[in-house]
Amino acid sequence: MTNKQTTINSSISLEGVGIHTGKDVKLTFNPAKPDTGYVFKRVDLEGQPLIEALSKYVVNTQRGTTLEKSGVKLKTIEHVLAALVGLEIDNVLIEINAEEPPIMDGSSRFFVDALEKAGLKELNSLRKEYVIKNIITYKDEKSGSEITVIPSETYQITAMVDYDTKVLGTQNASLSKLSDFKDNFSNARTFSFLHEIEMLLENNLIKGCLLYTSPSPRDSDT
């Protein structure tokens, strides 16, 4: 991993529909200067407001990550951000003409492929890195989800999910090198259970979802 900041060589666009809104949307990745980070630009709104992908702007994590700044929202951004982090891209301006990125096939692979096609460019500025010095734990009491960050000399992310269903059981995955993200993780797709579909539709969600986009496993063996 280089210690220099990176961006992309050229702009590149993807088009599709938002998984929850069902609206047509165009997203364009653009090169950005050092220390820009990940910034979304709502080109469909007056003034084309910017929303930085920072934790302080996260207002909802149910069925996706939602950012909000000055009343402007952006939903379901996690696959876009996963592609950027997985390819170790530090700076990019993301123009979008709707409140939700295109879902593509339900994974981050289309974004990874587009970013690689645009090409990566090293910038003449050093990366700013966080060093974890103490154990940090956060638990969401409502969902039961928990995350723990532990000081280490090596990079490793381990995730475990258990939906209390026979069809999926308990599943684990680990990532120790970001260079493995493209081949081993970028094809991972969002999904929902069949018993959830009616509830999601009643809540005005998954309007842009097709079965080939978001698999819906049964939560039993029958």
Describe these PLM feature segments.
Residues M104-G144:
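Long, charge-dense
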Residues L14-V17, T28, L81, G144-I150:
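A generic local secondary-structure boundary/capping motif
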Residues Y212-D219:
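Conserved small/polar residues in nucleotide/adenosyl-binding loops
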Residues I19-T21, P31-K33, L45-G119:
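N-terminal, charged/glycine-rich beta-strand/loop interface patches
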Residues T2-Q48:
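N-terminal basic/disordered segments at the start of proteins
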Residues I136-F193:
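Phosphate/diphosphate-binding glycine-rich loops and adjacent basic-rich segments that engage nucleotide
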Residues N9, G22-D24, N91, K133, ...:
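Broad gene-expression machinery/nucleic-acid interaction feature
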